[in-house]
């Protein structure tokens, strides 16, 4: 039996929340490719602390987006460190900026001011938990 697949230009709006280190940089590059192909509209990136604080992950995200030709996608840093447990970083493994030993240039990030309970736009949220070693509740797995 032969199956024919047709590709539709669905152009889904996407907001991604990530802790942009090496793995999430690859996820952003993949999303940039989907955006270039017209498959998604990358509306915004929000960042959390991971191997570095959320401010650095926002700078990393802005750098990757700029390299991918998407400098106008808003990037918003979340809480700079975890709320419950201390932030544990491993610069000897992930480098001082979380991108291995790539040193991103200083980048200002766009911010979105949102009143709690108010949404500027409704978009599906993509959380690359499997790619970041977290689970569905955002808990990090440690080896």
Region roles according to the model:
Residues 1-143:
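N-terminal acidic, glycine/proline-rich low-complexity segments
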């Amino acid at each position: 039996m032969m199956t024919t697949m047709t590709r539709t230009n669905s152009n889904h709006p996407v907001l991604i929340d990530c802790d942009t280190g090496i793995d999430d940089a690859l996820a952003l590059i993949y999303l940039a490719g989907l955006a270039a192909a017209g498959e998604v509209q990358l509306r915004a990136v929000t960042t959390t602390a991971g191997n570095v604080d959320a401010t650095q992950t926002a700078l990393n995200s802005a750098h990757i987006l700029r390299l991918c030709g998407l400098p106008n996608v808003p990037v918003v840093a979340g809480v700079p460190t975890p709320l419950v447990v201390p932030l544990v970083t491993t610069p000897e493994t992930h480098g001082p900026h979380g991108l291995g030993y790539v040193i991103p240039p200083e980048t200002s990030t766009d911010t979105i001011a949102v009143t709690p309970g108010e949404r500027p736009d409704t978009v599906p949220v993509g959380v690359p938990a499997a790619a970041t070693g977290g689970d569905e509740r955002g808990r990090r797995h440690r080896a």
